[in-house]
Amino acid sequence: MSENEDLQKSFLDTVKYDEKGLVPAIVQDHETGKVLMMAWMNHESLLMTLEKKKACYWSRSRQKLWLKGESSGNMQDVHDILIDCDGDTILLKVSQKGGACHVGYHSCFYRKVKETLDMEICDTLMFNPDDVYGKKS
């Protein structure tokens, strides 16, 4: 496919969803390039993200749309949406308000593996999840 033919396809026609109708989305800070999280999107969440310019995902555990930051206030303003060469992974470049991770860190990738295979915290704790989501019994 030539570059011109590739660009004439609609973005929405290019996305290749898996058998469950989902596509992985990598989320990156638009200024620093830091990877913040990975989440799943379906067609509806992708449309909502395009419309609102706020990141919206599909929660596999809750089986419903999930507007990032709706309960915590840690919204993601979407600056750019990119799609990989195969059309089966999306990259969102966002401005993150607060922490991206539900356990309170700026990034979900807050643990670094050391040579000893132990892990160390390598990110900033932004909030206490018990204060934001309430304590789980």
From Swiss-Prot:
Residue numbers binding Mg(2+): D84, D86, D88
Q: How is the cofactor bound?
A: Binds 1 Mg(2+) ion per subunit.
GO CC terms in record: cytoplasm
| EC supergroup of this enzyme | hydrolase
Q: Which SUPFAM superfamilies has this protein been placed in?
A: HisI-like
Q: Which reaction does it catalyse?
A: 1-(5-phospho-beta-D-ribosyl)-5'-AMP + H2O = 1-(5-phospho-beta-D-ribosyl)-5-[(5-phospho-beta-D-ribosylamino)methylideneamino]imidazole-4-carboxamide
Q: Where in the cell is it found?
A: Cytoplasm
Q: Which cofactor(s) are needed, names only?
A: Mg(2+); Zn(2+)
Annotated binding of Zn(2+), by residue: C85, C101, C108
Q: Which pathway is recorded for this entry?
A: Amino-acid biosynthesis; L-histidine biosynthesis; L-histidine from 5-phospho-alpha-D-ribose 1-diphosphate: step 3/9
Query: Which UniProt keywords are present, listed alphabetically?
Result: Amino-acid biosynthesis, Cytoplasm, Histidine biosynthesis, Hydrolase, Magnesium, Metal-binding, Zinc
Q: Which GO terms describe its biological process?
A: L-histidine biosynthetic process
Stated EC number for the protein is 3.5.4.19
Quaternary form?
Homodimer.
Protein family: Belongs to the PRA-CH family.
Extract the PANTHER family matched here: HISTIDINE BIOSYNTHESIS BIFUNCTIONAL PROTEIN (PTHR42945), HISTIDINE BIOSYNTHESIS BIFUNCTIONAL PROTEIN HIS7 (PTHR42945:SF1)
Q: What is this protein called?
A: Phosphoribosyl-AMP cyclohydrolase
